Amino acid sequence: MRARILLADHQRILTDGLSKLLEQFYDVVATATNGYELISLAKELTPDVIVTEISMPLLNGMDALRALKKSGLRSKFVVLTMHLDMGLAVQAFRTGASAYVLKLGSSEEIHAAVEAALHGRYYLSSAFPADLVTVLAEAARHSDEDGARLSRRQREVLQLVAEGKTMKEVAAVLGISTRTAESYKYEMMRSLGIRTSAELVQYAIRIGLIAVTPLRSAA
């Protein structure tokens, strides 16, 4: 019986290409374009493996992964991203991912990452030093301390603020009042000891809510 795969990426052209690649080996049951859609489809379809990007609108892949892990979903997670970022890789493994691979990697590497996840192993992109996979596997055994400091709603507000949305826009996306959105932001800043919006964005980057280190091909 072929393993069932759920894909998540906001760029449809990429999920279409990835779907064609993986359909040689697995059943691709659905594709999601944001974190909320990913959560809904994952709970409905209970795939064996979820292959997701980190950077997605509304709710990022890391928070979607975190929410699904807390829900008790037994799917394995492969992070497939453009970001060659050690901090994000650590965050992904701590949050529950089995593999972290780059979009610019080979099709064989993507296949290997999914196979590793299916068989209970960890896999790290060959773009990183080989010995780091041991470090990341150890990180996976520790709790997600940074993420645990904020509630899910606070993290939603934080991501939207870090993406550059106004508080009115944040409120509209989340279906809450502007005053409530502002209250979430104020309480976050107070509890984290953060004084400015710029520091809040830096915190969002540090815990992996948004990523700013895209992989550039060599000149």
List each model region and its residues.
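Short, flexible helix-to-coil linker/hinge segments that flank and couple to helix-turn-helix
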Residues: 87-94, 98-152, 156, 206-212
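Recognition helix of helix-turn-helix DNA-binding domains
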Residues: 164-199
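Active-site beta3 strand of CheY-like receiver
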Residues: 45-51
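Two-component/phosphorelay signaling modules centered on CheY-like receiver
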Residues: 12-30
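Short amphipathic alpha-helix used as the core "switch/output" element in two-component signaling
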Residues: 40, 62-74
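Acidic catalytic/metal-coordinating carboxylates
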Residues: 34-37, 58-63, 84
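Basic, Lys/Arg-enriched C-terminal extension of HTH/homeodomain DNA-binding domains
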Residues: 186-219
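Active-site residues of response regulator receiver
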Residues: 53, 81
